[in-house]
UniProtKB/Swiss-Prot annotation:
GO BP terms: cellular response to BMP stimulus; cellular response to interleukin-1; cellular response to tumor necrosis factor; chondrocyte differentiation; collagen fibril organization; extracellular matrix organization; negative regulation of chondrocyte differentiation; ossification involved in bone maturation
Motif Cysteine switch, residue range(s) on this chain: 202-209
Natural source organism: Homo sapiens
Tissue specificity comment: Expressed in heart, brain, placenta, lung, liver, skeletal muscle, kidney and pancreas. Detected in meniscus, bone, tendon, cartilage, synovium, fat and ligaments.
Domain notes per entry: The spacer domain and the TSP type-1 domains are important for a tight interaction with the extracellular matrix.
Range of residues in the leader sequence: 1-27
Record-annotated TSP type-1 domain positions: 538-593, 821-880, 881-940, 942-995, 1411-1459, 1462-1522, 1523-1567, 1569-1629
Disintegrin domain: residues covered: 462-537
Protein name: A disintegrin and metalloproteinase with thrombospondin motifs 7
pH-activity profile: Optimum pH is between 7.5 and 9.5.
Domain of life: Eukaryota
Quaternary context: Interacts with COMP.
Biased composition regions of type Polar residues, renumbered to the chain: 1182-1205
Disulfide-bonded cysteines: C318-C372, C347-C354, C366-C447, C405-C431, C474-C497, C485-C503, C492-C522, C516-C527, C550-C587, C554-C592, C565-C577
Length: 1686
């Protein structure tokens, strides 16, 4: 046989998965009673004797024979006392007959094949089955269940161990001697404890089915329906006595094994032990096991199939036992449960032997078809198997299966899934106690409430070990050949039996009473002497515990208090406590905050972190009305549910949706009254008053009678707390009732234009029943409502009326009081979405509401508290795809057959009010695509074309002339030509310049090659539009640099420097040099102002004002009036054909100092000197200030100063020189102060300075010379010269042939008598006066004068430093400054003498005139230049070698001009922006003839000898124009009433679209009024057949105000809905008129009407149908009828 674990090694525990039942101790066939016990060693043999209460010996006969036969009057509750010696200890048994073991009508019957063999009804059964306690003076005693019918046989507890006792088979009782008995400890089953085997196979039978308890719950409900008088459950857990009326069946193998009549005694002994286990206090309930019927099967029953297959055996037995059960609980033989004892080796789900010991239905007690169990006989431990299976019938599950009572260590319990190797007493665990208590409190054990009708027969009981010695116990367990194994272990701990050659144990101790020594036996696992049995101790209740913590923090939780039956604990067969065991009360009644999950949901969520079949789930509760107090949950998004707990936490509502307060308490649904007491039965009256009588109930009713309405209309308000609500239509109508909350957008019923089905709906905390029969609607609810509910009517047709009423609670005495009105602002419903697809807008208006009256005028509410109307976006279903077509572009041609207009066509979907999304074209394939091109302007004929002739010859042979040609309209199309497209008929032609003979002047004496009148009259000769070159951004904005300056006009922005024609400038300059050698009579005066006009001498203009008289400033400079640009601006170049400004890199800044800096050697950073803004006086070409005169109003403004003509070494000096006898040209010169010395000739006035806020310009006077010079750090000082021209002369001078005499210049600051002038302030242009009043050289010099030169570096206090007092002028003039770097511009240049002889020469001696000396002239040198301004030189010397000897007046000309043609070339400006960015345009640029030296403008004929003039026009923008891209129109800003749509307009490539064809970006939309047609429901057909008409109401309604429009034309933008339609078109079936039985009016009256001929009237014919109908031919007359009746 399979082995078991080694001794004292615990068997592994299995996690229970079974619900029906498990095995405890499998047995093996054992010997029959009376067999030999040889081979058994270490048996504790005891010799019990019967004693009295004091311990005195009474008899060796353990149960008196006389008592069995005669003394039937002996008290059944008389105790029996026994003593025995067990392991040297004296044990005393105090036993009492088990009065509840056998029912008064107990029947023991034997069944044979074919029927009942015999039945024995015992009216007075021997009371030899005893219950009580064993005591030891030192050891702790315990319960004892002993049968004393034939010796002592049973079980008892000692020292927390179980012991069996039974008589010793080998030593039968002898008269006068004590009968030997065997005592041994309870052991684990042999097959689980076979020596040397460590495995413990499972002994569980049937797997758990979670729906078993649900089935039981449903069965209980059906039983309650069948038995309505069943009392309801009580609020408290009450301990009540229960009697389990039991049928015990022993199968044929049992009877054969134990034999007759011992088998009956054996079975009763087992059941007596079972009854003792159910009397253990650990079970927590008083339960009596009572046998009403014992059936012994000698043969197999035909309908009872007992096999190894436990499941089939249980099924067969349950069916069989039900068939033999007596109907009616009052029958003496009716049993509550049935127990089968069999010697078959059971196996769950298989028909072969295995380890299963028993099987039972879980929670099957009191169910006739399920209250049954089967148990495998294993000897006396069979009692524990029976108790285990009965525990399953009471709904107890295995310890550790779904609970936390898994056995720990060696402490087993009765409901443990397996037995452990331990002899400790088996008791009920805490979980078993809770299971059986809940089973009974549920009312599932009602069949156990009836006790047996008669007294129970007393019969004696002795410990089983007295009746069955150890050898007998081995034979009972292992068969007839088994014997006790000696010296293996303490028999009171473990019973070891020999099976073949091996000792086996079932880990059970020998039963109590088993002999273990001299006068000792096993008791409760110890070998003790037989002791005295104490008095029975009934149990007593302890005090109530403190109330537990509330099971919930809100929402009505539960607290409990309990007491235990521990003061004292029942002992020695004492009675268990009866009465209230646990009480409950409610707590934390306040409602939980809104939004919290339900209490069941919280309990389900506790399992979210636990794996279920290897996965984590989010559990949500499942409603289970059958078992409302079980926790059933399902994973979210799954479709299966699982019972996660047998019972929910106390305080969980039984039902989630029902309006019930019932709570689950201790796994049972308890009723909660309105007073919040459990099972109080308190009820509310009809208005919700608990224990009320209805006196405070007030019924409110009303009728809504408005006949017409639009959409949802408020009917009335049901307040919170309303009950008995009834709402119904007065008559049938096609309208619909609706319910909404105070939130206008929250509807409970029929909201959102959606009609719901009939049924129950949760509304405001209660249930409304919605019923619609035909067109008649009503709503009912018991209430109460937890919030106000608005009744609304959805109009479809005229309203016949809506009646509503409800009941509300009002305090008594308050009926006559009118509550004050309460006004408040509320939001109305949201309007319909402004769009039917995509995203739109909804609005919610605010209205004033009175609590009772409903909506009222806004004047009643507080205007300051009025909330703003709300607006929100609304989203409808996506808009369908559609084609969008843009606007037609401008026609490609304004006339002719080729005109074509295009537009963009896109597939789009409207997303929102102002948003569209583009789709692929296939999305719009279901719609026809709009055309993208259309012909245009093809009906318009094009204008005629222009025809042109050939150009004529130029009108001049040189210079500029004109050319002409004929231009005619061809009239080829019949339409006049377009004047705007007419070609030019006259153009300007330019030929080479007209040249004058060299050395001669023009007709007017001008050296320019043309007359001054010609120059003056050519308005386009010098471009007036040229502006000064802008200064860099880092420089301050320059001041004005105009030529015409007026005093006291500092605000005027005067034009900057402009350019003059270098040709005239250069020629005049050369004439000036000719004046140096020719006398006044030889060379005429030249105009040095740079105007190009010859100015008459002062004496020839008598009208000119005196030079000494000031002229007031009366008007701005003439230059600005003539179109010359004013102050510099960032864009001073207007487009003009043939003209272009100098390139930006060549533009001259407006800062005056820049014009004086060297161009070639000056670094780029020169403009960053930070020069201040100032006004620069108009300076003529020769350096003179030239005020504007009437004659010079059209003078060309001066551009660059003449210093820029100098070579680099001399460009830092500007010398303006004029002779003393010359007058400055112009007018308006101010009166100058007189000379400081009276010996000097008077000064000539120079001109006026430009007035500024701080006059920073001083005036200089010299001996006949006035010079303007800016003096600034790094600037240039003035140079005074009378005889030597300093402008452009250095480039004309050849190296000197003869040394010049040395001349010295003394600084004026060191000379006495120098006048002082105001010192310029910081930041201004410093002008230094150099006056050489007494330092003029003798006039006999050759024309070299003194040129005092100021310092370039400022001295202290801002005054310029001076040079040394005496500096040779000639060496300074003919020397080259050494510029080492641009940084040296602030220092005085180091001069390098060109002629050392000149530097060394001293002052000249007095002149000694040599007679006959004459001038000698050398050969002319080559021209200094090939073009432009040049000169030739020749040496001139006096024949005597001393120039002083020759007359200066006769000196030949040493230099003269050459090559008068300027170096000219065409200069092209930048191309202008194309006139059209696409489609063919033109670009222009300015082409000018300029001097190649400094790009000064020249007249065009200067460039004609050179290359041809570059083109000034060119085509551009030839690429074709692209179409403008336009997005889809955005949603209209208004749904109606006129809005605006916008769209994006852009060019795919910037600049490649025709701007003139740019589409509009906005357009008006939704111009129709805000109205729509509103239709009502169709009315009833006017006729059910034969052609009828249905009509409906059609109105034009303003969607903004909701009011109908008087003028239906306002809805003209929508199609008129049909207001009628045909119906009932099927043909009517012919209907026979109803048969007239009798007249409705009296017979006499009808006869009178008939006689009067009124039967022709339909009403009369209907009322008197019998009288008015013609008599039938076959009908007897009334007279005949009367005769017949007679």
């Amino acid at each position: 046989m399979p082995g078991g674990p080694s001794p004292r090694s615990p068997a592994p525990l299995l996690r229970p998965l079974l619900l029906l039942l498990c095995a405890l101790a499998p047995g093996a066939p054992g010997p029959a009673p009376g067999r030999a016990t040889e081979g058994r060693a270490a048996l504790d043999i005891v010799h019990p004797v019967r004693v009295d209460a004091g311990g005195s010996f009474l008899s060796y006969e353990l149960w008196p024979r006389a008592l069995r036969k005669r003394d039937v009057s002996v008290r059944r509750d008389a105790p029996a006392f026994y003593e025995l010696q067990y392991r040297g200890r004296e044990l005393r048994f105090n036993l009492t007959a088990n009065q509840h073991l056998l029912a008064p009508g107990f029947v023991s019957e034997t069944r044979r094949r074919g029927g009942l063999g015999r039945a024995h009804i015992r009216a007075h059964t021997p009371a030899c089955h005893l219950l009580g306690e064993v005591q030891d003076p030192e050891l702790e005693g315990g319960l004892a269940a002993i049968s004393a019918c034939d010796g002592l046989k049973g079980v008892f507890q000692l020292s927390n161990e179980d012991y069996f006792i039974e008589p010793l088979d080998s030593a039968p009782a002898r008269p006068g001697h004590a009968q030997p008995h065997v005592v041994y400890k309870r052991q684990a089953p042999e097959r689980l404890a076979q020596r040397g085997d460590s495995s413990a196979p499972s002994t569980c039978g049937v797997q758990v089915y979670p729906e078993l308890e649900s089935r039981r719950e449903r069965w209980e409900q059906r039983q309650q329906w069948r038995r309505p008088r069943l009392r309801r459950l009580h609020q408290r857990s009450v301990s009540k006595e229960k009697w389990v009326e039991t049928l015990v069946v022993a199968d044929a193998k049992m009877v054969e094994y134990h034999g007759q009549p011992q088998v009956e005694s054996y079975v009763l002994t087992i059941m007596n032990m079972v009854a003792g286990l159910f009397h253990d206090p650990s079970i927590g309930n008083p339960i009596h096991i009572t046998i009403v019927r014992l059936v012994l099967l000698e043969d197999e029953e035909e309908d009872l199939k007992i096999t190894h297959h436990a499941d089939n055996t249980l099924k067969s037995f349950c069916k069989w036992q039900k068939s033999i059960n007596m109907k009616g609980d009052a029958h003496p033989l009716h049993h509550d449960t049935a127990i089968l004892l069999t010697r078959k080796d059971l196996c769950a789900a298989m028909n072969r032997p295995c380890e299963t010991l028993g099987l039972s239905h879980v929670a099957g007690m009191c169910q006739p078809h399920r209250s049954c169990s089967i148990n495998e006989d294993t000897g006396l431990p069979l009692a524990f198997t029976v108790a285990h299976e009965l525990g399953h019938s009471f709904g107890i599950q295995h310890d550790g299966s779904g609970n936390d009572c898994e056995p720990v260590g060696k402490r087993p319990f009765i409901m443990s899934p397996q037995l452990l190797y331990d002899a400790a007493p088996l008791t009920w665990s805490r979980c078993s106690r809770q299971y059986i208590t809940r089973f009974l409190d549920r009312g599932w054990g009602l069949c156990l409430d009836d006790p047996p009708a008669k007294d129970i027969i007393d019969f004696p009981s002795v410990p089983p070990g007295v009746l069955y010695d150890v050898s007998h116990q081995c034979r009972l367990q292992y068969g007839a050949y088994s014997a006790f194994c000696e010296d293996m272990d303490n028999v009171c701990h473990t019973l070891w039996c020999s099976v073949g050659t091996t000792c086996h144990s079932k880990l059970d101790a020998a039963v109590d009473g088993t002999r273990c020594g001299e006068n000792k036996w096993c008791l409760s696992g110890e070998c003790v002497p037989v002791g005295f049995r104490p008095e029975a101790v009934d149990g007593g209740w302890s005090g109530w515990s403190a109330w537990s913590i509330c099971s919930r923090s809100c929402g009505m939780g539960v607290q409990s208090a309990e007491r235990q039956c521990t003061q004292p604990t029942p002992k020695y067969k004492g009675r268990y406590c009866v009465g209230e065991r646990k009480r409950f009360r409610l707590c934390n009644l306040q409602a939980c905050p809104a939004g919290r999950p339900s209490f069941r949901h919280v309990q389900c969520s506790h399992f979210d972190a636990m794996l279920y079949k290897g996965q984590l789930h989010t559990w949500v509760p499942v409603v289970n009305d059958v078992n409302p107090c079980e926790l059933h949950c399902r994973p979210a998004n799954e479709y299966f549910a699982e019972k996660l707990r047998d019972a929910v936490v106390d305080g969980t509502p039984c039902y989630q949706v029902r309006a019930s307060r019932d709570l689950c308490i201790n796994g049972i649904c308890k009723n909660v009254g309105c007073d919040f007491e459990i099972d109080s039965g308190a009820m509310e009256d009809r208005c919700g008053v608990c224990h009320g009588n209805g006196s405070t109930c007030h019924t409110v009713s009303g009728t809504f009678e408005e006949a017409e309405g639009l959409g949802y209309v408020d009917v009335g308000l049901i307040p919170a707390g309303a009950r008995e609500i009834r709402i119904q239509e007065v008559a049938e109508a096609a309208n619909f009732l609706a319910l909404r909350s105070e939130d206008p957008e929250k509807y409970f019923l029929n909201g959102g234009w959606t009609i719901q089905w009939n049924g129950d709906y949760q509304v405001a905390g209660t249930t409304f029943t919605y019923a619609r029969r035909g067109n008649w609607e009503n709503l009912t609810s018991p209430g109460p409502t937890k919030e106000p509910v608005w009744i609304q009517l959805l109009f479809q047709e005229s309203n016949p009326g809506v009646h509503y009423e409800y009941t509300i609670h009002r305090e008594a005495g308050g009926h006559d009081e009118v509550p004050p009105p309460v006004f408040s602002w509320h939001y109305g419903p949201w309007t319909k979405c402004t769009v039917t697809c995509g995203r739109g807008v909804q609005r919610q208006n605010v209205y004033c509401l009175e609590r009772q009256a409903g909506p009222v005028d806004e004047e009643h509410c507080d205007p300051l508290g009025r909330p703003d109307d709300q607006q929100r976006k609304c989203s409808e279903q996506p808009c369908p795809a559609r084609w969008w077509a843009g606007e037609w572009q401008l026609c490609s041609s304004s006339c002719g057959p080729g005109g074509l207009s295009r537009r963009a066509v896109l597939c789009i979907r409207s997303v929102g009010l102002d948003e569209q999304s583009a789709l692929e074209p296939p999305a719009c394939e279901h719609l026809p695509r709009p055309p993208t091109e259309t012909p245009c302007n093809r009906h318009v004929p094009c204008p005629a074309t222009w025809a042109v002739g050939n150009w004529s010859q130029c009108s001049v042979t040189c210079g500029e002339g004109t050319q002409r040609r004929n231009v005619l309209c061809t009239n080829d199309t019949g339409v006049p030509c377009d004047e705007a497209q007419q070609p030019a008929s006259e153009v300007t032609c330019s030929l080479p310049l007209c040249r004058w003979p060299l050395g001669t002047l023009g007709p007017e004496g001008s050296g320019s090659g043309s007359s001054s009148h010609e120059l003056f009259n050519e308005a386009d000769f010098i471009p007036h539009h040229l502006a000064p070159r802008p200064s860099p951004a880092s420089s301050p904005k320059p001041g004005t640099m105009g030529n015409a300056i007026e005093e006291e006009a500092p605000e005027l922005d005067l034009p900057g420097p402009v350019f003059v024609d270098d040709f005239y400038y250069d020629y005049n300059f050369i004439n000036f040099h000719e004046d140096l050698s020719y006398g006044p009579s030889e060379e005429p005066d030249l105009d040095l102002a740079g105007t190009g006009d010859r100015t008459p001498p002062p004496h020839s203009h008598p009208a000119a004002p005196s030079t000494g008289s000031p002229v007031p400033a009366t008007e701005p400079p003439a230059a600005k009036e003539e179109g010359v640009l004013g102050p510099w601006s960032p864009s001073p170049w207007p487009s003009q054909a043939g003209r272009s400004p100098p390139p930006p890199s060549e533009q001259t800044p407006g800062n005056p100092l820049i014009n004086f800096l060297p161009e070639e050697d000056t670094p780029i950073g020169a403009p960053d000197l930070g020069l201040p803004s100032l006004s620069w006086p108009r300076v003529s070409t020769d350096g003179l200030q030239t005020p504007a005169t009437p004659e010079s109003q059209n003078d060309f403004p001066v551009g660059k100063d003449s210093q820029s003509q100098l070579p680099p070494p001399w460009r830092d000096r500007t010398n303006e020189v004029f002779k003393d006898d010359e007058e400055p040209k112009g007018r308006g010169a101010p009166h100058l102060p007189p000379r400081p010395s009276s010996t000097l000739p008077p000064l000539s006035p120079v001109g006026s300075t430009h007035s500024s806020p701080s006059p920073d310009v001083a005036e200089l006077w010299t001996g006949g010379t006035v010079a303007w010079e800016p003096a600034l750090e790094g600037g240039l000082g003035p140079v005074d010269s009378e005889l030597w021209p300093t402008v452009g002369v250095a480039s004309l001078l050849p190296p000197p042939i003869a040394p010049l005499p040395e001349m010295k210049v003394r600084d004026s600051s060191l000379e006495p008598g120098t006048p002082s002038f105001p010192t310029p302030g910081p930041g201004s242009w410093d002008l230094q006066t150099v006056a050489v009043w007494g330092t003029f050289l003798p006039t006999t010099l050759t024309g070299l004068g003194h040129m005092p030169e100021p310092a370039l570096n400022p001295g202290p206090k801002g005054q310029p430093e001076s040079l040394s007092p005496e500096v040779p002028l000639s060496s300074r003039l003919l020397s080259t400054p050494a510029w080492d770097s641009p940084a040296n511009s602030h220092r005085v240049p180091e001069t390098q003498p060109l002629a050392p002889s000149l530097a060394e020469a001293g002052p000249p001696a007095d002149p000694l005139v040599v007679r006959n000396a004459g001038w000698q002239a050398g050969n002319w040198s080559e021209c200094s230049t090939t073009c432009g301004l040049g000169a030739v030189w020749r040496p001139v010397r006096c024949s005597s070698g001393r120039d002083e000897d020759c007359a200066p007046a006769g000196r030949p000309q040493p230099a003269r001009r050459c090559h008068l043609r300027p170096c000219a070339t065409w200069h092209s400006g930048n191309w202008s922006k194309c006139s059209r960015s696409c489609g063919g345009g033109s670009s222009v640029r300015d082409v000018q003839c300029v001097d190649t030296r400094d790009l000064r403008p020249l007249r065009p004929f200067h460039c004609q000898p050179g290359p041809a003039k570059p083109p000034a026009h060119r085509p551009c923008g030839a690429q074709p124009c692209l179409s403008w891209y336009t997005s889809s129109w955005r949603e209209c800003s208004e749904a109606c009433g006129g809005g605006e749509q916008q769209r994006l307009v852009t060019c795919p490539e910037p600049g490649l679209c025709e701007e003139a064809l740019r589409p509009n970006t906005t357009r008006p939309c939704n111009t129709h009024p805000c109205t729509q047609w509103v239709v009502g429901p169709w009315g009833q057909c006017s006729g059910p057949c034969g052609g009828g008409v249905q009509r409906r109401l059609v109105k034009c309604v303003n969607t903004q105000t909701g009011l109908p429009e008087e003028d239906s034309d306002q809805c003209g933008h929508e199609a008129w809905p049909e207001s009628s339609r045909p119906c009932g078109t099927e043909d009517c079936e012919p209907v026979e008129p109803p048969r007239c039985e009798r007249d409705r009016l009296s017979f006499g009256f009808c006869e009178t009407l008939r006689l009067l001929g009124r039967c022709q009237l339909p009403t009369i014919r209907t009322q008197c149908c019998r009288s008015c109908s013609p008599p039938s031919h076959g009908a007897p007359s009334r007279g005949h009828q009367r005769v017949a009746r007679r």
